[in-house]
């Protein structure tokens, strides 16, 4: 079987993420693609605040562009197409686009327990973000 790659993204960009705008630096877009999965699109330089998913694992699947994922107290991990990150419950983290690239990742939660919630915290500082290359 021959595998072909394509140079376009099949996932919809979605609508401006107005409900969560105050929890992001920059603009993001959200598309519900079904089955509890969302495509999140970040403009260059956009990232979400530090946050914790209580009683749920979050899975990120990078589908286009380039960006970053970072857990509190650890080095940032580069996101690029094909990278999958499984974020354990109770881990403080953030994710977003690189300064010079859009980023799209699929996001869903698994192993969701009763009482699951998100705790949004402080913004990722410009100083911290600007260290990433």
Language-model regions, residue ranges each:
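Ligand-binding loop in jelly-roll beta-barrel domains
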Residues: 68, 76, 80-81, 89-116
């Amino acid at each position: 079987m021959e595998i072909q790659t394509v140079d376009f993204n099949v996932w919809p960009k979605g609508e401006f993420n107005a409900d969560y705008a105050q929890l992001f630096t920059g603009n993001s877009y959200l598309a519900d693609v079904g089955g509890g999965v969302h495509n999140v699109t970040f403009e260059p330089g956009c990232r979400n605040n530090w946050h914790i998913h209580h009683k749920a694992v979050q899975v990120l699947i990078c589908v286009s562009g380039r960006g970053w994922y970072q857990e509190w107290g650890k080095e940032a991990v580069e996101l690029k197409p094909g990278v999958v990150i499984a974020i354990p419950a109770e881990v403080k983290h953030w994710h977003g686009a690189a300064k010079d690239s859009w980023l799209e990742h699929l996001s869903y939660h698994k192993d969701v327990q009763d009482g699951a919630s998100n705790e949004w915290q402080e913004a990722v500082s410009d100083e911290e973000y600007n260290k990433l290359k």
